[in-house]
């Protein structure tokens, strides 16, 4: 988490030392979502704004619907727009007007299914990280609630919809694997910790940059992403995730109502 926070903090809206007299007294509304690093950064950013003399409010928000909330002015900014998960919602809101691209962080991102690296080091599923190794490893990843199949633990369904269930079927793994959805990032990290303690294999959704970069995590290598490969875009959905950008979004009025905070 420290790595991600450092990257995001370095790329946050460039802030001058003191609040401008032009900055509105209207609160800057910052959303909080269902993954811990986003919540931590929301309060870090809010603290910076408050130190400049700005008023700040925090509101829980759905990670897809937040861009409509920004467009309508109910939310002011979003500091973590991950391309693979939220790019479409972000651009759809921009196309309607009211949302602006407030810049791109330097880090490239990847959002994908993977395994803790020790699963590979212990050779629990020979052939990983190549996805085809999964054909012979369902028992390694079976859990009490997976009905004898191997389990993929996805993030909340609001993040990607049916992207992973479609991929499992498209790869011909549907008879051997089932996708379960976690309630939030904390549930993913809890499963990761439990798997390590129990010495069992686990396939979970993860992203980079993240604190697990240092802990040791390996993304599974699925068929390469190409334009149009996902089912929603006319493909069969078997492809993996693309490397992508990490952006910031803001209400179109923000540069005018809070020029010092935005500059």
Regions found by a protein language model. Give the residues of each.
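Pocket-flanking alpha-helical
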Residues: 42, 61-97, 187, 191-195, ...
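Short coil/turn segments
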Residues: 33-35, 118-120, 155-160
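Gram-negative bacterial Sec-dependent N-terminal signal peptides
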Residues: 1-20
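Ligand-binding pocket segment of bilobal, Venus flytrap-like solute-binding proteins
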Residues: 75-80, 153-233
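Short, well-ordered beta-strand elements
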Residues: 23-37, 54-59, 149-153
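C-terminal lobe and pocket-closing loops
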Residues: 213-263
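Short, polar/charged alpha-helical segment
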Residues: 36-55, 166-169
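A conserved helix-loop-strand patch within extracytoplasmic ligand-binding domains
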Residues: 98-153
